[in-house]
């Protein structure tokens, strides 16, 4: 342990002197994964600081512990320890009331066992504690699990560890293929009697002798290991006494359960309806990201802004945006997308099922699908990014294609019209001469040239640095998306070789024509083709009946509904002018209002064909989202609504229902409700006058009948 760590430990101890040691709930966070499953990214940055939906992984773990009442958290750092310490010092964890986060370092640690022996040597753990990986995301009720662990300890002091599991199917998206756990446990006490974590094995067996002690044993293959353990101090002592313990699951648990000398017991705690998952490889990184976007991790979701340094808001289709995001022209932001502040997306670009960080510049006609774009990335016009990770500071030049499953490291420069084949891994990192396996590690790097073909007068710093292709092949299933041959390997041993063509880490070639788009999802294709149909109809002045026939054909071909059609038609009608050479960008609000009135009136027979009572409220919200993404239309939201009402595309009932839904929102939705107040009041007064007129007519009829 370094001098600074000793000082931190001493200051930490003095600050907690007022509390009795048994009253302090402590946790040990493993800040190192001791593997290369995120290489080459983790050659430059620790896994715990990698962004997951634009928030460092470590923040999810610390937030979970703090919310669970943990008062003292020790983060044990090994690789890139200085980065973790610097991050904690500069974050809210440095002085958060009620929670003390202390960094400990072990520069010579090579395994989890070494780290736990380091914690033992520090003598900072006083009682039962939480042992957790620094890449865990959870919203579980930890206090309930702690109480069950304490109750078990009172009954039997030899019950030294409770392991947390989540019930899920064997094919669940957050279940890593390399963490294929089978446990055998006492049905009544949940004591674990046998543990098997061998993905290559086709069957699991148990000793018959165990049934003499445990008459009722159940086999559980429906559990995901959350890597959250509630431990007694004896666990650290056992690691200190056994230097051959390198891994908790493979060594410690196996030894405890099979030892004839030790009488220690391990138990399981199974979550019901709560969330916990570890981001242990690229596949689970993708899965947990989707779970966060779909709000399974609530309250740790983007729009809850739980780290107090973000400004996300949620709109329909699971789209999260921070403030000061610029969406230009007719760019399309599709489902399951997160966009950080100060990011700009150019006209004609399509972003779907992706996370984009802060301060990114996305050019025109860029296509990004299923990808993770971190902070300060530049992607120029006509580039295609397919299910890939682009790390901070990288530059992707125009017309380049990043194949599915690729990883682009920090500050990498991809030249114009370059194509990276699927599962390429590119890094600016160089092999470390201080590594123990220097010769082996050097073999993982191969220098490549990704600069522009005509690279005579470029001043970009990224271009002039040495770029390497990372050649270390990932373990089976450890890719952001499945390889084609993954399904083949489901039925064979995991140590057999995969597709030889992928071992090079991906080839690079020039791309002069990327018209064929290999990544466009059906929803995006439909939106684009309907938009093209409307634009062609405007320019060529086609009859509305012909346009309707074409859109109906697309509707059935892509299995879309009327609302999908309207949300694809309206943006084009509003953005495009009657002349193909002019747009709405330079007109005044009054001119824009007049243009909208004429355009909606002219196309109302077409719009009515796709409108239905069931979808009218949703259509209003879609128009609101469109105005959010296109600032110039915010001021004419009410005229758009008015024209759609006048032309029977939406009803007054739908407008009333929309207003009722957003009433009380003073920020985002409140702006639109305020804009429409006069129009809604007019509708209500007109409705009341109509009701009064109807009542008067009824009275006249009654009097006539009485006469």
Swiss-Prot record:
Keywords for the protein's UniProt record, in alphabetical order: Cytoplasm, Transferase
Region: Disordered, residue numbers: 489-526, 686-707
Biased composition (Acidic residues): 688-707
Entry's Gene Ontology BP terms: cytoplasmic translational initiation
CDD domains: eIF-2B_epsilon_N, LbH_eIF2B_epsilon, W2_eIF2B_epsilon
GO cellular component: cytosol; eukaryotic translation initiation factor 2B complex
Localization, UniProt: Cytoplasm, Cytosol
Domain W2: 516-693
Principal place of residence: cytoplasm
InterPro entries, sorted: ARM-type_fold, eIF-2B_epsilon_N, eIF2B_epsilon, NTP_transferase_dom, Nucleotide-diphossugar_trans, W2_domain, W2_eIF2B_epsilon
Molecular function as annotated in GO: guanyl-nucleotide exchange factor activity; transferase activity; translation initiation factor activity; translation initiation factor binding
Function noted in UniProt: Acts as a component of the translation initiation factor 2B (eIF2B) complex, which catalyzes the exchange of GDP for GTP on eukaryotic initiation factor 2 (eIF2) gamma subunit. Its guanine nucleotide exchange factor activity is repressed when bound to eIF2 complex phosphorylated on the alpha subunit, thereby limiting the amount of methionyl-initiator methionine tRNA available to the ribosome and consequently global translation is repressed.
Self-association state and partner proteins as the record states: Component of the translation initiation factor 2B (eIF2B) complex which is a heterodecamer of two sets of five different subunits: alpha, beta, gamma, delta and epsilon. Subunits alpha, beta and delta comprise a regulatory subcomplex and subunits epsilon and gamma comprise a catalytic subcomplex. Within the complex, the hexameric regulatory complex resides at the center, with the two heterodimeric catalytic subcomplexes bound on opposite sides.
Family affiliation: Belongs to the eIF-2B gamma/epsilon subunits family.
Protein name: Translation initiation factor eIF2B subunit epsilon
Organism of origin: Dictyostelium discoideum (Social amoeba)
GN (gene name): eif2b5
């Amino acid at each position: 342990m370094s001098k600074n760590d000793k000082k931190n430990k001493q200051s930490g101890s003095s600050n907690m002197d007022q509390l009795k040691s048994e009253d302090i709930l402590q946790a040990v966070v493993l800040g190192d994964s001791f593997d290369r499953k995120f290489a080459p990214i983790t050659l430059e940055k620790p896994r715990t600081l990698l962004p997951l939906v634009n928030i460092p992984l470590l923040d999810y773990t610390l937030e979970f512990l703090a919310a669970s009442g943990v008062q003292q958290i020790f983060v044990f750092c090994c690789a890139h320890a200085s980065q973790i310490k610097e991050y904690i010092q500069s974050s809210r964890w440095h002085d958060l009331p009620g929670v003390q986060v202390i960094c400990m370092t072990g520069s010579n640690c090579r395994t989890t066992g070494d780290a736990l022996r380091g914690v033992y040597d520090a003598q900072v753990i006083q009682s039962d504690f939480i042992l957790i990986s620094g890449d865990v995301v959870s919203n579980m009720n930890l206090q309930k699990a702690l109480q069950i662990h304490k109750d078990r300890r009172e009954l039997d002091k030899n019950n030294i560890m409770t392991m947390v599991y989540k019930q899920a199917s064997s094919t669940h998206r957050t279940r890593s293929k390399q963490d294929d756990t089978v446990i055998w446990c006492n049905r009544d006490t949940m004591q674990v009697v046998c543990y098997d974590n061998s993905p290559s094995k086709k069957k699991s067996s148990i000793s018959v002798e165990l049934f003499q002690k445990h008459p009722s044993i159940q086999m559980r293959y429906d559990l995901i290991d959350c890597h959250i353990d509630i431990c007694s101090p004896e666990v650290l002592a056992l690691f200190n006494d056994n230097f051959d313990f390198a891994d908790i699951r493979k060594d410690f648990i196996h030894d405890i359960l099979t030892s004839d000398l030790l009488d220690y017991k391990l138990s399981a705690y199974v979550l019901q309806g709560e969330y916990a998952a570890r981001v242990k490889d690229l596949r689970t990184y993708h899965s947990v990201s989707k779970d966060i976007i779909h709000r399974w991790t609530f309250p740790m979701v983007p729009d809850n802004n739980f780290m107090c340094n973000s400004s996300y808001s949620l709109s329909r289709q699971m789209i999260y945006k921070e403030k000061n995001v610029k969406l230009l022209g007719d760019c399309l932001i599709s489902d399951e997308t997160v966009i950080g502040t100060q990011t700009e997306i150019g006209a004609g670009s399509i972003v779907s099922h992706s996370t984009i960080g802060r301060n990114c510049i996305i050019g025109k006609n860029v296509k990004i699908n299923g990808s993770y774009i971190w902070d300060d990335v530049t992607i120029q016009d006509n580039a295609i990014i397919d299910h890939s990770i682009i790390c901070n500071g990288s530059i992707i030049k125009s017309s380049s294609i990043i194949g599915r499953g690729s990883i682009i490291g920090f500050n990498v420069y991809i030249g114009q019209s370059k194509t990276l084949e699927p599962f390429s891994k590119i890094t600016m990192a160089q092999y470390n001469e201080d590594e123990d396996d220097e010769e082996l590690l050097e073999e993982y790097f191969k220098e490549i040239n990704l600069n522009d073909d005509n690279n005579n007068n470029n001043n970009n710093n990224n271009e002039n640095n040495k770029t390497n292709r990372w050649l270390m092949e990932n373990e089976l299933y450890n890719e952001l998306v499945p390889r084609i041959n993954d399904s083949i390997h489901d039925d064979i041993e995991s140590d057999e070789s995969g597709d030889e063509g992928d071992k090079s880490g991906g080839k690079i070639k020039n791309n002069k024509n990327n018209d064929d788009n290999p990544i466009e999802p059906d929803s995006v294709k439909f939106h684009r083709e309907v938009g093209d149909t409307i634009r062609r109809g405007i320019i060529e002045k086609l009859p509305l009946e012909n346009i309707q026939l074409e859109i109906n054909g697309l509707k059935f071909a892509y299995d879309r509904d009327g609302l999908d059609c309207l949300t694809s038609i309206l943006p084009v009608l509003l953005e495009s002018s009657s002349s193909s050479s002019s747009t709405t960008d330079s007109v005044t609000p009054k001119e824009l209002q007049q243009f909208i009135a004429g355009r909606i009136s002219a196309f109302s027979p077409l719009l009515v064909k796709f409108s239905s009572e069931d979808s009218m409220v949703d259509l209003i919200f879609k128009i609101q989202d469109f105005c959010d993404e296109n600032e110039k239309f915010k001021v004419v939201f009410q005229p758009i609504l008015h024209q759609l009402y006048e032309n029977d595309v939406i009803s007054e009932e739908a407008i009333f229902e929309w207003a009722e839904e957003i009433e009380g929102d003073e920020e985002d939705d409140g702006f639109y409700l305020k804009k429409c107040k006069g129009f809604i009041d007019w509708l209500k007064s007109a409705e009341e006058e109509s009701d009064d007129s109807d009542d008067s007519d009824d009275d006249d009829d009654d009097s006539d009948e009485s006469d």
